[in-house]
Amino acid sequence: MQLTVWTYEGPPHVGAMRVATGMEGLHYVLHAPQGDTYADLLFTMIERRDRRPPVTYTTFAARDLGKDTAELFKTAAQNAYDRFKPQAMIVGASCTGSLIQDDPGGLAKALALPIPVVAIDLPAYQRKENWGAAETFYQLVRAIAGPKAPPPGSKRPERPAGKRPSCNLLGPTALGFRHRDDIIELTTLLGKLGIDVNVTAPMGATPADLARLGEADFNVVMYPETASQAASWLHRMFHQPFTKIVPIGVSATREFIEEVAKLADVDPTAVLKSYSSRLPWYSHSVDSTYLTGKRVFIFGDATHVVAAARMASDEMGFKVVGLGTYSREFGREIREAAKLYDVEPLITDDYLEVEAKVAELHPELVLGTQMERHIAKRLGVPCAVISAPVHVQDFPARYAPQMGFEGANVIFDTWVHPLMMGLEEHLLTMFRDDFEFKDGATPSHLGVGHAPAPAPAVADSAAVEVLDATTATTTETTTAVWAADAEKELRKIPFFVRGKARRNTERFANENGVATITVETLYDAKAHFSR
């Protein structure tokens, strides 16, 4: 067990809640203690939903453990059916609830409710949230669509002549990163190709919709973390092919269009010619030359990390210096992507390891989750959020997809805005020693009363000459003092690597017994660490 203040994924029953909350007409009865009801806040506070998730908790307390907790679950399940009248119900236990070893599936079956009841058995201490969402969706699809599967060995019937091809969009859930807007973007894009969307699931689907999944010609896997298992099962049982390309970025979107056009047997030429994104021109224009070569570190779920790395490298001219994921189930995909950029993959769910890696690599931009936003802020590095888990500000009121051509536009703006433009950096360098615009100047709108505290005194050249031998002997355990001319020279170094240069120089000075850092020391340190 590990004590931590942050986790990238919750326990697997939170993943099941994401599926249930995204759907309509489905209710989740969760065998859980009072403390596990915190999960409601994820949806009402962070995602800003206007209603509670469709979850009933048994909320047993310590005093109930000496009684019949099984009867408590049966009562909660019956009351949930009587009150909400769902089309289907899923039952399971939270991580804490699983310790008392009741059987929610068997108990619910004993009630003989007149609706489908799907037992979700989630290994709470071996798996996490995304796996729980994928397993829940898979079990629902299998239980509800399974009875309509054709006999084994039968061939899929041909689509009637004149009927438009159709597909299912699989994977979007509640609490997903921009899932709501991605659905709209892909539905519009597929409509331009002459392809109808049969069912979007889990988000927005009812149990009755899940029974119709087999009617589509193929499936679009929007988010492999939650949909790949269900898509593979539909492929085996209904002979429905599914897409492999996630349309995040201009190049990936064009490849996605060609992929679905082949599956649907339609001509994509007109759509490829008519659709365009501003990203390619912006990233090639003179105004965007300051993007080229920016060092970027990427961390998040595997789908968004792999897509972001490709966009950063191929479409925006960034240099990927590190990437990783907290999704151990997709470690293979991350390792393969890391080989393309000649970097070491970071596969961990410990945010402290991620912070240490960012500090080590000194990137100029961090792309990650809400935690990477905090890490980058502490380290003074620009950051943009590309993946769940996210906080409330990343569920915007505006339309802001990540997929498709419009998604590429949104991503370009999101990534570029935290960066300092070339002209801006040039002007800061030009006026760095100006009496009004220097680094330590108080912003004019704050007035004189808000002047910052004076900086620590810096040794001048005279002080360097009068240092005695006694002072020199103590420098091994104290931080070296910066001479005024060295401090001035340091300010000429670009801001995004200035901190690293300062730390390396001070380390060099302390290791070599230099009491006062001069310009010569600064360049000696540079030569030393460049080897």
From Swiss-Prot:
InterPro entries: ChlB/BchB/BchZ, LI-POR_suB-like_C, Nase/OxRdtase_comp1, P-CP_red_C, Protochl_reductB, Protochlorophyllide_Rdtase. [4Fe-4S] cluster binds at D36. The active site is at D287 (proton donor). It comes from the Bacteria. It holds the Pfam family PCP_red. GO terms for biological process: light-independent bacteriochlorophyll biosynthetic process; photosynthesis, dark reaction. Substrate binds at G422, L423. Its EC number is 1.3.7.7. Its cofactor is [4Fe-4S] cluster. Disulfide bonds: none annotated. One of its GO terms (molecular function) is oxidoreductase activity, acting on iron-sulfur proteins as donors. It is an enzyme of class 1 (oxidoreductase). HAMAP family: ChlB_BchB. Protochlorophyllide reductase is composed of three subunits; BchL, BchN and BchB. Forms a heterotetramer of two BchB and two BchN subunits. This is Light-independent protochlorophyllide reductase subunit B.
